[in-house]
């Protein structure tokens, strides 16, 4: 059994900080569960281009407000209780509204190793 707290993970190398977001990676590839689990904060008033070409992701909004815009498609509002699933490697823009920092619970398949950040194309690399 694996038991971890958000606080202990936040105060370790499992916390990764980027320009528009920070992510506490609570479950990673080395845990051998077949997926990874993160609590990610999207900073207020930001827009992040993301295109997970190597991963599928499901995201549940726990707090805050924003929107997700699928490139070439629709824009969907995000608020607490919203789940969105990137089941087609959807290229998108994630926006947190001003004064509405979003806290999200995220699941990735395949799992990430922990140190990944988006490259210039919004992609996480696939690491064996």
From Swiss-Prot:
Keyword entries, A-Z: Lyase
MF terms in GO: ectoine synthase activity
Reactions listed under catalytic activity: (2S)-4-acetamido-2-aminobutanoate = L-ectoine + H2O
E.C. numbers: 4.2.1.108
Pathway stated in the Swiss-Prot or TrEMBL entry: Amine and polyamine biosynthesis; ectoine biosynthesis; L-ectoine from L-aspartate 4-semialdehyde: step 3/3
UniProt entry tagged with the keyword Lyase: yes
GO terms classed as biological process: ectoine biosynthetic process
Disulfide bonds: none
Family that this chain belongs to: Belongs to the ectoine synthase family.
PANTHER family, A to Z: L-ECTOINE SYNTHASE, PTHR39289
Classification via NCBIfam families: PRK13290.1 (NF009806)
The protein's role, per its UniProt record: Catalyzes the circularization of gamma-N-acetyl-alpha,gamma-diaminobutyric acid (ADABA) to ectoine (1,4,5,6-tetrahydro-2-methyl-4-pyrimidine carboxylic acid), which is an excellent osmoprotectant.
UniProt protein name: L-ectoine synthase
Organism, as annotated: Vibrio parahaemolyticus serotype O3:K6 (strain RIMD 2210633)
């Amino acid at each position: 059994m694996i038991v971890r707290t958000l606080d202990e993970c936040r105060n370790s190398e499992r916390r990764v900080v980027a320009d528009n977001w920070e992510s506490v990676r609570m479950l990673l590839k080395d845990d051998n569960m077949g997926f990874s689990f993160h609590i990610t904060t999207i900073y207020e008033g930001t827009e992040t281009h993301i295109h997970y070409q190597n991963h599928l992701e499901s995201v549940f909004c726990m707090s805050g407000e924003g929107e997700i815009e699928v490139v070439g498609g629709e824009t969907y509002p995000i608020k607490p209780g919203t789940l969105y699933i990137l089941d087609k490697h959807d290229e998108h823009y994630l926006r947190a509204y001003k004064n509405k920092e979003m806290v999200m619970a995220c699941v990735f398949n395949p799992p990430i190793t922990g140190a990944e950040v988006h490259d210039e194309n919004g992609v996480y690399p696939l690491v064996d």
